[in-house]
Amino acid sequence: MTEHAIKYRLIKKEKHTGARLGEIITPHGTFPTPMFMPVGTQATVKTMSPEELKTLGSGIILSNTYHLWLRPGDELVAEAGGLHKFMNWDQPILTDSGGFQVYSLVQNKKNITEEGVKFKSHLDGRELFLNPEKAISIQNNLGSDIMMSFDECPPFYQPYDYVKASVERTSRWAERGLNAHRRPNDQGLFGIVQGAGFEDLRRQSARDLTSMDFAGYSIGGLAVGESHKEMNAVLDFTTPMLPEDKPRYLMGVGAPDSLIDGVIRGVDMFDCVLPTRIARNGTLMTHFGRVNIRNAKYEHDFTPLDPMCDCYTCTNYTRAYLRHLIKADETFGLRLCSYHNLHFLVNLMKDVRGAIMDDNLLEFREDFCERYGYNQPNAKDF
């Protein structure tokens, strides 16, 4: 068994659910779990400085392999001393494998072969090729603490035979990536469990990957068009297949109820572009549901955005001012809204950790969802 660069320490299990309180130890520090990870696609979390991210308590951020490979280039990042030095972030960084972006750019399934994937750059249309070895090489150059295996992420509603072939290929790719990994002493590599909504294929994927001794395991192929109920069902049968002594990461999930429901089912780590993406449209998450700050009813509203929030935005600025900034397309408005949404999710996870410690996570979920509006007949999900 390898001595992994990433270690998981279980602190406590919640009595009534599968939730677990723990911490993940990395070469750039330790962060508590469950944790929401802000996404810094281009080596920056949009509109936020590293200092602000530390202030709001995000102990780890995510960056995107595909985007950094194309621009500025992984070799330039390596020349700068790695991603941490390049972006002046001295805490843990996770990089994805680029697979998710690649599959959104593939024009024909025939371009996905055993060797890898052919696709066109979203920047200039030139033809590119990515495979397991290249994805690992890029991430070794970036120097992230946690890396992802190159996987195929099929849409949720695909025929069984297609998903089965995809799972088997992803397992072979995972082994190739593990063999190509040059820095196991200071970078932990995660395997990604796929299988859409098919329990036997998820089991096959988990069995294949857990036999390979990765540093941790991701659950992929969710938040790709399936319902909330379907996601929970997949988590119900998938997380118990994963080792208890390693981190579990649910990829691409950031809606508040999905975060809580993932934790209930034993997930430790989550990421999503949701908080910053919706902030740019003036949509804000509050303890009382979502707010579209562009709405005319906030024009003369001189109260804080969220009376239960103590973030910089809510303690200093009013709804009327935020509405004005967003309507005027002012950069400061994007910053204030992004800061609030990130603070909201990072602190939601802090509250969730407290609820696990107190063994009352189900009551916490009920109170939160009722206040947020999820339990109303017309409640809207993000």
UniProtKB/Swiss-Prot annotation:
Arranged from A to Z, the UniProt key words for this protein are: Glycosyltransferase, Metal-binding, Queuosine biosynthesis, Transferase, tRNA processing, Zinc
Question: Which transformation does this protein catalyse, written as a reaction?
Answer: 7-aminomethyl-7-carbaguanine + guanosine(34) in tRNA = 7-aminomethyl-7-carbaguanosine(34) in tRNA + guanine
Its UniProt pathway annotation is: tRNA modification; tRNA-queuosine biosynthesis
Residue sites binding substrate per the record: D96, S97, G98, G99, F100, D151, Q194, G221
As to how many cofactors bind and how, the note says: Binds 1 zinc ion per subunit.
Task: Give the residues the record marks as binding Zn(2+).
Answer: C309, C311, C314, H340
**A Pfam family this chain is assigned to:** TGT
GO process terms (BP): queuosine biosynthetic process; tRNA wobble guanine modification; tRNA-guanine transglycosylation
Q: Does the keyword Transferase apply?
A: yes
Would you say which domain of life the source belongs to?
Bacteria
Q: Name one GO molecular function term.
A: tRNA-guanosine(34) queuine transglycosylase activity
Active site residues according to the UniProt entry = D96, D271
Q: What EC number(s) does its UniProt record assign?
A: 2.4.2.29
**By its UniProt entry, which InterPro entries does this protein fall under?**
ArchSynthase1/Queuine_TRR, TGT, TGT-like_sf, tRNA_ribo_trans-like
Region (RNA binding) residue ranges read 252-258, 276-280
Q: Name one GO cellular component term.
A: cytosol
- List all disulphide bridges recorded for this chain: none
The prosthetic group or cofactor this protein requires is: Zn(2+)
The entry's family comment says: Belongs to the queuine tRNA-ribosyltransferase family.
Q: What function does this protein fulfil?
A: Catalyzes the base-exchange of a guanine (G) residue with the queuine precursor 7-aminomethyl-7-deazaguanine (PreQ1) at position 34 (anticodon wobble position) in tRNAs with GU(N) anticodons (tRNA-Asp, -Asn, -His and -Tyr). Catalysis occurs through a double-displacement mechanism. The nucleophile active site attacks the C1' of nucleotide 34 to detach the guanine base from the RNA, forming a covalent enzyme-RNA intermediate. The proton acceptor active site deprotonates the incoming PreQ1, allowing a nucleophilic attack on the C1' of the ribose to form the product.
Subunit and partners: Homodimer. Within each dimer, one monomer is responsible for RNA recognition and catalysis, while the other monomer binds to the replacement base PreQ1.
NCBIfam families to which the protein is assigned, alphabetical: Q_tRNA_tgt (TIGR00430), tgt_general (TIGR00449)
Protein name as catalogued: Queuine tRNA-ribosyltransferase
Question: What is the originating organism of this protein?
Answer: Lactococcus lactis subsp. lactis (strain IL1403)
Q: Name the encoding gene, please.
A: tgt
